């Protein structure tokens, strides 16, 4: 606690809680779980990420906008202090989908939940959404991250069929081959570790820094990739699209998976 760059006001809010650092996440944010029963979470990003989708101020703005539209954590406190953005929030309601359902035991249920998420997202009115994650916006952000050595890139973890030798080559391809977009609400980083469930239904979402207006296909490739990697049978990819009532656009799916290699 002593090493945290937080204001006296925030310190007073959290001093009674037991503080445990979360080591699961892959983003540059620092995340702490506070408490054991009525939990709070403190998420912190340094000023180098200001204005990017990693910045917790952006996540705070989206959480406030999503109140009444989607089940999201409550914003308890936000501040910029000593070069850091600090977001204190409530715990999401329910249990993580990744903990509630085993992929090999409940594949149909997981597919149903992914489809439910996509339908929920696409039903939201985005006319006053505070952030746009169009490809122009994401690629401009990516250029900044690459130029400042802030991009989360590990070429060894790229998909086996990724034909690019380095991040800049992939970036150039993504900029040249941008598909047309039809904007809807998008989570931006969807997966079973971002979805909470309760009584068999979606009950919450976390990690909302990349949410906002984006192409309607933006979240779908994350679901397809998770189904293939975690369940492994192509029939469940087909079931996913059957539940959505659409045919897969494989070019867009491949494009957005490639884009995610650099975030």
Swiss-Prot record:
It comes from the Bacteria. One of its GO terms (molecular function) is ATP binding. GO terms for biological process: response to antibiotic. The keyword Protein transport does not apply. It catalyses: kanamycin A + ATP = kanamycin 3'-phosphate + ADP + H(+). The keyword Transferase applies. Keywords: Antibiotic resistance, ATP-binding, Kinase, Nucleotide-binding, Transferase. The active site is at residue 189. It is an enzyme of class 2 (transferase). Its EC number is 2.7.1.95. Resistance to kanamycin and structurally-related aminoglycosides, including amikacin. Belongs to the aminoglycoside phosphotransferase family. This is Aminoglycoside 3'-phosphotransferase.
């Amino acid at each position: 606690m002593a090493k945290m760059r937080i204001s006296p006001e925030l310190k007073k809010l959290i001093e009674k809680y037991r503080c445990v650092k979360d080591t699961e996440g892959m983003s540059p944010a620092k995340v702490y779980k506070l408490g054991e029963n009525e939990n709070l979470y403190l998420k912190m990003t340094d000023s180098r990420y200001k204005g990017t989708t990693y910045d917790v101020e952006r996540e705070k703005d989206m959480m406030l906008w999503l109140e009444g539209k989607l089940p999201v954590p409550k914003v308890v406190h936000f501040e910029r202090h000593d070069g850091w953005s600090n977001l204190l929030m409530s715990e999401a309601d329910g249990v993580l989908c990744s903990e509630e359902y085993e992929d090999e035991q409940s594949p149909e249920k997981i597919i149903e939940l992914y489809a439910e998420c996509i339908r929920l997202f696409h039903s939201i009115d985005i006319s006053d959404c505070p952030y746009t994650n169009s490809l122009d916006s994401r690629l401009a952000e990516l250029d900044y991250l690459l130029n400042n050595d802030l991009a989360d890139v590990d070429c060894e973890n790229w998909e086996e069929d990724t034909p690019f030798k380095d991040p800049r080559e992939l970036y150039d391809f993504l900029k040249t081959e941008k598909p047309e977009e039809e904007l809807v609400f998008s989570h931006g980083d969807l997966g079973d570790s971002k979805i909470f469930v309760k009584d068999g239904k979606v009950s919450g979402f976390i990690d909302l820094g990349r949410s906002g207006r984006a192409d309607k296909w933006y979240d779908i490739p994350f679901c397809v990739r998770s189904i293939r990697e975690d369940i492994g049978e192509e029939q469940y990819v087909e079931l996913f699209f059957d539940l959505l009532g659409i045919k897969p656009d494989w070019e867009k799916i491949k494009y957005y998976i490639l884009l995610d290699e650099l975030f």
